[in-house]
């Protein structure tokens, strides 16, 4: 048999009835074959004007030419559409055909349905015609399939225009297209997966203005179609990183799957059966979300295409006329290292059409993909993060051992720290990361509240974050900044801190956070001071306002959550510590200045340096030393404020390096003088204890955790850069509070764009003039709104900057003129020693917690405590199956020719589900 049956409304396909998720056979997703060559798929009716088509398109041989000619000549199938349009002009090139379909999508968005029908019909015919002139079989078949799809859509759109379909706004249906991958190795497949899964990549253009409607609009991930439901989903966010970073991240994930596979069932430290054995890869789904099609590194796309996870031709042709916000590629990867094959990785590559933000990428991941899968656990990480081979195992083990844990993070470290010891910026960050893990996260984990689970590598129990916590997490995506204001806008620069707090304070729950030391991940960090300034601006602003938010809303833990009385009392202790630590950080620039002033320069002036006799110097020389110090320090601070207001750090690189070097020399001089004073004066118990609790804590805690060599090798680097961390980063951050580009740029639709799309330029002359005047008025109001928002944000920036600067200035002047070194320094030492004592006790407590795990497991069973059930949250997934069953029933109703049947809309079906 040759030729394809014309895709008419009366044709009933034989194997396209959608079944519930867990029962849909793979064969039902294939198109009808003739003489061994799959022909273009007929349309599938599922709901209103919507459709769901899954078709596999071969690329080795072209479709028979007669099938295309039969389709074009069968005009009776499109009689209604032709009567409406009555015009047809052949478009001679692929570029013009694609452009016509894009204009059709724009007309459809503007609700100019008859114009859209005309353009879709022209574009569909053009696709079918230009396909015959393509020498490449792959391009020929893709164009032919697109032509069939578009003309079928024209027939359905015509039915809607003439009132035969009841639906509010018609949209092209879901069309998932599969093509063979080029790098398939038939010798590799072996026992892990079948040939079909290994050879095929699937692409779906996604039109979904709101990701939460992904499932309701009929989109399905490939693993759902094949009856799989992964228990662990991993989100990898990507922006413009190179291919080497993505390659390293994926291979480290494959190593983690191999480690999970080798776990022995029944062992005391083994995971449940889903995360062990040869089929462990089927319970893990990796989602790579790229923020903007134009922003992705071209070589990264080349790498993705090489491994079968991207195809430019497929995207260009099949997304035409859809107006897709996201391009979805799905494939089970086959990676190898040095000829050794790794476990398969079920992978989804979501390429967003427009740049929005990392938060928007998480919005797609959580509300579209994870909401459909309903995994038990979900992890988030950045491209470039490299997990050690057992990192995922340790996180999953913590979740399975204690079902009260709602979120957990591993130990994040700097990549190749010892190879970069000559780079002081990298070494200082390595010290900071280590101390944060050893002291801060260990302390917070003892209380059950980790202030921030880093987006570079952390994991959550999906049950703990689904609902209210995620709604709060994505708040800035749904509400305009004019309404939120600058405080909340800056707070959401550290949205992961908000998510952590919302999980712990969740109403009627008692979730806790946990730090897993053995789950180690290496990450790439900024290599120079300028790059670090830009990064820390986002971190510091977000952390400061998020901390104020958590302090202000701490009462929710007591009034809304179901934590035990003992846990709430522990949170009260942590709240006091958190409050003192935040206050100390606010006045840290003044305290740093005062410490340098009293230790070095006033000691030099008053001959209090035991190892240097300054009595022989004239008073003028002694006073000049103090004046020079004050002038240099103040000049450096003023310079930082001036260049921080409205200047990009990249344009002031030399200035920042100069100021950082001056502050670094002052800090090193202070450290040497302080060491000289300590070793030249008689030792007392008080001085030894204070010294240990201020500086020795870093070495004691790191030695306890077996990482003291990291601290020894990078302590000098960090000491020299302390003034840069305190002064440069903080001043630049407060000088740019009005800049929220990291968390909010491009997150909101432009109302002017929507207005221009709705403008039809139809009607009489007066109507057109009135519409143009209305659009001009809208533009004027939008301009005023943007200017007012800019003024409000800049005023907020100025007020906060002045408050912070004058608070530190007044505090420093008060101490200098009304206190002495003998009064201030002991108070400072005791305060710092007290905070560090708390951190040390927390580090020791976490060390004891780790090394008594076996004993606690025999005494305390937390496998069924808390909110976790240890099972899937089945309710939502059952609703999803009911939703797709309803779509399948609508499809069968339409295909059987029962034209009088009541066809439900997508919203009606989702409400019923």
Curated annotation (Swiss-Prot):
Keywords: Cell membrane, Cell wall biogenesis/degradation, Glycoprotein, Glycosyltransferase, Membrane, Transferase, Transmembrane, Transmembrane helix, Virulence. It is found in: Cell membrane. A motif (Conserved SWG motif) lies at residues 741-743. Its cofactor is Mn(2+). Its main location: membrane. The chain crosses the membrane at residues 539-559, 581-601, 625-645, 658-678, 684-704, 711-731, 800-820, 825-845. UDP-N-acetyl-alpha-D-glucosamine binds at residues 237, 241, 291. One of its GO terms (molecular function) is chitin synthase activity. GO terms for cellular component: plasma membrane. Gene3D superfamilies: Phosphotransferase system, lactose/cellobiose-type IIA subunit (1.20.58.80). The activity is inhibited by nikkomycin Z (NikZ). It comes from the Eukaryota. Pfam families: Chitin_synth_1 (PF01644). Changing residue 432 to A: Greatly impairs the catalytic activity. InterPro entries: Chitin_synth, Chitin_synth_fun, Nucleotide-diphossugar_trans. Changing residue 359 to A: Leads to 70% loss of activity. Induction: Expression is low in the mycelium and during most infective stages except at 48 hpi, but increases in sporangia and zoospores, and peaks in germinating cysts. Homodimer. Polymerizes chitin, a structural polymer of the cell wall and septum, by transferring the sugar moiety of UDP-GlcNAc to the non-reducing end of the growing chitin polymer. Involved in mycelial growth, sporangial production, zoospore release and pathogenesis. This is Chitin synthase 1. It comes from Phytophthora sojae (strain P6497). The lineage of its organism: Eukaryota, Sar, Stramenopiles, Oomycota, Peronosporales.
């Amino acid at each position: 048999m040759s030729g394809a049956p014309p895709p008419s409304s009366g044709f009933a396909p034989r194997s396209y009835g959608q079944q519930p998720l867990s029962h849909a056979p793979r064969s039902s997703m294939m198109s009808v074959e003739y003489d061994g060559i799959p022909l273009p798929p007929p349309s599938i009716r599922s709901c209103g004007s919507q459709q769901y088509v899954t078709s596999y398109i071969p690329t080795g041989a072209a479709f028979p030419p007669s099938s295309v000619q039969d389709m074009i000549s069968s005009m009776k199938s499109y009689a209604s559409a032709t009567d409406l349009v009555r015009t047809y002009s052949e478009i001679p090139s692929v570029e013009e055909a694609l452009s016509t379909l894009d204009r059709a999508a724009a007309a459809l968005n503007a609700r100019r349905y008859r114009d859209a029908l005309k353009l879709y019909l022209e574009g569909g015919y053009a696709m079918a015609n230009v396909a015959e002139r393509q020498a490449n079989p792959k391009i020929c078949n893709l164009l032919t399939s697109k032509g069939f799809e578009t003309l079928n859509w024209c027939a359905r759109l015509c039915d809607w225009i003439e009132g035969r379909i009841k639906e509010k706004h018609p949209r092209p249906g879901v069309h998932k297209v599969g093509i063979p991958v080029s790098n398939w190795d038939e010798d590799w497949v072996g026992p892990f997966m079948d040939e079909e899964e290994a050879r095929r990549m699937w692409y779906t253009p996604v039109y979904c203005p709101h990701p939460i409607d992904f499932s309701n609009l009929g989109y399905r991930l490939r693993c759902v179609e094949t009856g799989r439901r992964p228990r662990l989903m991993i989100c990898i966010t990507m922006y413009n990183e190179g291919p080497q970073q993505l390659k390293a991240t994926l291979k480290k994930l494959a190593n983690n799957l191999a480690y999970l596979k080798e776990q022995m069932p029944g062992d005391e430290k083994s995971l449940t059966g889903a995360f062990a054995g040869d089929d462990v890869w089927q319970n893990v789904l990796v989602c790579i979300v790229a923020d903007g099609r134009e922003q992705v590194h071209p070589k990264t796309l080349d790498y993705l295409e090489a491994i079968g996870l991207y195809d430019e031709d497929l995207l260009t042709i099949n997304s035409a006329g859809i107006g897709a916000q996201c391009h979805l590629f799905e494939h089970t990867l086959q990676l190898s290292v040095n000829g050794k094959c790794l476990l398969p990785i079920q992978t989804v590559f979501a390429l967003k059409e427009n740049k929005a933000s990392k938060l928007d990428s998480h919005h797609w991941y959580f509300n579209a993909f994870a909401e459909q899968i309903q995994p038990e656990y979900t992890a988030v990480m950045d491209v470039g993060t490299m997990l050690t081979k057992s990192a995922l195992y340790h996180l999953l083990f913590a979740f399975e051992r204690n079902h009260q844990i709602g979120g957990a993070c591993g130990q994040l470290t700097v990549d190749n720290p010892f190879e970069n010891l000559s780079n002081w910026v990298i070494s200082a960050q390595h010290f900071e990361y280590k101390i944060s893990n050893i002291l801060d996260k260990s302390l917070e984990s003892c209380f059950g509240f980790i202030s921030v689970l880093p987006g570079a590598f952390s994991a959550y129990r999906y049950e703990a974050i689904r609902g209210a916590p995620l709604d709060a997490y994505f708040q800035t995506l749904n509400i305009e900044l004019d309404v939120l204001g600058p405080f909340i806008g800056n707070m959401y620069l550290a949205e992961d801190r908000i998510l952590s707090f919302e999980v712990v304070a969740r109403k009627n729950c008692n979730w806790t956070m946990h730090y897993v030391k053995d789950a180690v991940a290496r990450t790439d960090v900024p290599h120079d001071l300028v790059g670090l300034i830009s990064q820390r601006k986002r971190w510091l602003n977000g952390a400061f306002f998020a901390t104020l938010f958590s302090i202000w809303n701490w009462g929710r833990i007591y009034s809304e959550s179901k934590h035990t009385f003992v846990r709430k009392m522990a949170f009260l202790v942590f709240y006091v510590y958190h409050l003192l630590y935040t206050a100390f950080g606010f006045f840290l620039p003044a305290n740093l200045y005062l410490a340098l002033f009293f230790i070095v320069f006033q000691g030099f002036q008053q001959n209090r340096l035991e190892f240097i006799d300054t009595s022989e110097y004239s008073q003028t020389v002694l006073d000049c030393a103090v004046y020079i110090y004050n002038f240099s320090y103040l000049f450096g601070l003023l310079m930082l404020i001036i260049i921080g207001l409205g200047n990009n750090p990249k344009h002031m690189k030399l200035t920042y390096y100069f100021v950082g070097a001056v502050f670094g020399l002052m800090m090193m001089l202070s450290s040497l003088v302080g060491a000289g004073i300590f070793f030249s004066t008689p030792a007392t118990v008080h001085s030894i204890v204070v010294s240990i609790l201020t500086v020795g804590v870093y070495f004691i805690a790191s030695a306890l955790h077996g990482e003291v060599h990291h601290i020894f090798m990078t302590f000098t680097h960090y000491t020299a850069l302390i003034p840069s961390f305190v002064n440069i980063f903080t001043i630049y951050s407060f000088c740019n509070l009005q800049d929220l580009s990291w968390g909010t740029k491009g997150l909101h639709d432009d109302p002017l764009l929507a207005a221009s799309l709705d403008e039809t330029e139809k009607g009489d002359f007066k109507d057109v003039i009135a519409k143009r005047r209305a659009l001009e008025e809208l533009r004027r109001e939008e301009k005023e709104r943007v200017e007012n928002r800019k003024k409000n944000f800049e005023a907020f920036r100025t007020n906060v900057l002045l408050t912070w600067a004058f608070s530190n200035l007044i505090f420093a002047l008060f101490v200098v003129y009304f206190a002495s070194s003998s009064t201030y320094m002991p108070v400072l030492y005791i305060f710092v020693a007290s905070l560090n004592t708390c951190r040390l006790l927390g580090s020791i407590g976490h060390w004891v917690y780790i090394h008594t795990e076996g004993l606690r497991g025999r005494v305390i069973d937390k496998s069924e405590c808390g909110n976790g059930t240890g099972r899937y949250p089945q309710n939502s997934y059952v609703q999803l199956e009911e939703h797709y069953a309803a779509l399948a029933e609508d499809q069968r109703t339409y295909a059987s020719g029962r034209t009088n049947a009541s066809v439900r809309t997508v919203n009606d079906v989702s409400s019923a589900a």
